[in-house]
């Protein structure tokens, strides 16, 4: 399997999100990289499904709550930016204050 560096990055995000979701299912609070992975994966998959940038910017802030992450994590993450592939091309999606 020949993957480009971009495809490898997407695969790594996806795998990290899978691990983080398993931890959430067990009731474990997420750390910084796990929270970033879940939200980034949500954006990448939403773009693939045909959702708009505006929809993902709004819904990306509803993926995780403060109760699902370790103390201090929401204050550490002010913005998440993900380059996602939409049906009409690649666009940058920014989610402001993603954990509320």
UniProtKB/Swiss-Prot annotation:
Source species of the chain: Bradyrhizobium diazoefficiens (strain JCM 10833 / BCRC 13528 / IAM 13628 / NBRC 14792 / USDA 110)
Protein name (database record): Urease subunit gamma
Gene3D superfamilies for the chain: Urease, gamma-like subunit
Top-level taxon of origin: Bacteria
GO cellular component: cytoplasm
Subunit description: Heterotrimer of UreA (gamma), UreB (beta) and UreC (alpha) subunits. Three heterotrimers associate to form the active enzyme.
Coiled coil: none
InterPro entries: Urease_gamma (IPR012010), Urease_gamma/gamma-beta_su (IPR002026), Urease_gamma_sf (IPR036463), Urease_subunit (IPR050069)
NCBIfam families for the chain: PRK13241.1, urease_gam
SUPFAM superfamilies linked: Urease, gamma-subunit
One GO BP: urea catabolic process
Keywords: Cytoplasm, Hydrolase
Similarity annotation: Belongs to the urease gamma subunit family.
Enzyme class, spelled out: hydrolase
The protein's Enzyme Commission number: 3.5.1.5
Cross-referenced HAMAP family: Urease_gamma
Location of this chain's protein in the cell: Cytoplasm
Pathway noted in the entry: Nitrogen metabolism; urea degradation; CO(2) and NH(3) from urea (urease route): step 1/1
Main location: cytoplasm
Keyword Ribosomal protein: no
Reaction equations catalysed: urea + 2 H2O + H(+) = hydrogencarbonate + 2 NH4(+)
